[in-house]
A protein has these predicted regions:
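Acidic, proline/glycine-enriched N-terminal capping motif
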Residues: 1-79, 83, 88-91, 99-101
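Short amphipathic beta-strand starts and helix->beta connectors
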Residues: 28-37, 80-92, 97, 127-130, ...
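Acidic, low-complexity central loop/insert segments
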Residues: 40, 49, 94-224
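Short glycine-/aliphatic-rich beta-strand segments at the starts of folded cytosolic domains
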Residues: 42-64, 135-155, 271-282
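Glycine-centered loop/turn motifs
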Residues: 74-76, 162-170, 287-292, 329
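Glycine-rich, small/acidic residue-mixed loop/short-helix segments
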Residues: 93, 242-250, 260, 264-349
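Anionic-ligand-binding alpha/beta catalytic cores of soluble enzymes and soluble regulatory domains
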Residues: 190-280
Length: 349
């Protein structure tokens, strides 16, 4: 069963699919409201997945990304940035290994699917004589997300256990489970499984959950303070601007990687002058990644990183901006006020 075939099966469950993305299951506003109150289940076919194989896979990636690939030993995941030589981000990866890469397992990089082809092409340019194979496996494992107050409890009968720590990865007989950061009294997971097991697992979870579309998952990611890179925001941000140092997505102890000089200088000179904030925006129009935000004198001070409709009928967003501008007064997207809120992690200026 391919991802396309999987989504065809979801269409029989009232999934509304646009360009390969499950947008909702018939009632977007009710799904958003349910996301705040109960257990929700979401198809994640829209996420891209690269598989990095070969004897040199770990050492190759170590020279490409900001985090320490050697820490991925089969039971954990972490975020990591992929930068250009000027330290500006080309992509954000959620990196993990289903099995210890030193024992022959493979590494995976999950990313925004719209960036997959150009990023894969760029990575392959640097393989040269290394024993590395890079493949698009986005359609191989069936991926879905689970969030809610009873999410962990729902997984146990299906997998025998569930991970308890954020970014803990369990590889089990019928799939793998990755625990992701959540807010409130919820727990959040991504499930990876194969075509044979996917229907059974999905249907069992569906019986206890509200089915929701990608916008609900995006909103959950925003609440957790997890940024994203799109084609509109490539090469716009040094990793610290998106709080990646606060998300443990940068290693300052590992060896060299592309863009390291700029990233390290920003860290050691204490020169982080821009951060990403959680905000709400009251508007009838949807803020888009890359849209500029202004101060009261119409000077550009930052931009939208990602945004999604919220349950109250407006929008929540992650907004990158100058720290001094945020502290000086009101910030606007078009004519709408950008009202900042507390992130689930501490923001260090």
């Amino acid at each position: 069963m391919t991802a396309t075939e999987w989504q065809t099966s979801l269409a029989t469950q009232d999934a509304v699919i646009e360009n390969g993305v499950v947008m909702h299951f018939g009632n977007p506003s009710a799904e958003l409201l349910a996301t705040t109150k109960t257990n929700v289940l979401c198809d994640l076919t829209h996420l891209g997945l690269l598989e990095i194989n070969g004897a040199d896979a770990a050492s190759f990636l170590q020279g490409q990304v900001t985090n320490d690939v050697k820490l991925l030993v089969g039971n954990n995941a972490h975020y990591t940035a992929y930068c250009n030589p000027k330290g500006r981000m080309l992509a954000l990866f959620l990196a993990f290994a289903h099995h210890n890469h030193e024992l022959g397992g493979h590494l995976h990089l999950q990313l925004n699917r719209e960036l997959l082809e150009p990023i894969m092409k760029r990575l392959k340019m640097y393989v040269m004589r290394s024993k590395v194979e890079i493949k698009d496996v986005s359609d191989s494992p069936i991926k879905f997300g689970l969030n809610g107050p009873e999410a962990a409890k729902l997984l146990v009968p299906l997998f025998t256990k569930a991970p308890s720590q954020d970014y803990e990865l369990l590889s089990l007989e019928n799939g793998a489970i990755l625990k992701l950061p959540a807010t409130g009294n919820n727990t959040r997971f991504e499930v990876f499984t194969d075509a044979a097991n996917a229907p059974t697992i999905w249907n069992a979870l569906k019986a206890e959950c509200q089915l929701v579309g990608k916008p609900c998952w995006d909103w959950l990611e925003i609440q957790a303070g997890i940024p994203d890179i799109t084609s509109a925001t490539q090469e716009q941000f040094v990793p610290q601007m998106l709080n990646l140092d606060l998300l443990n997505a940068i290693s300052f102890k590992k060896g060299c990687y592309t863009g390291q000089e700029i990233v390290a200088r920003t860290h050691y000179l204490g020169s982080v002058k821009r951060r990403t904030y959680l905000a709400s925006i009251e508007s009838d129009r949807t803020p888009l990644a890359g849209d500029k935000v202004m101060d009261g004198t119409k000077n550009e001070v930052g931009q939208i990183v990602r945004a999604a409709a919220n349950p109250s009928g407006s929008f929540d967003a992650l907004v990158e901006m100058r720290i001094d501008a945020k502290e000086a007064g009101s910030i606007y997207w078009n004519d709408a006020v950008v009202t900042t809120k507390n992130l689930p992690y501490a923001l260090e200026s």
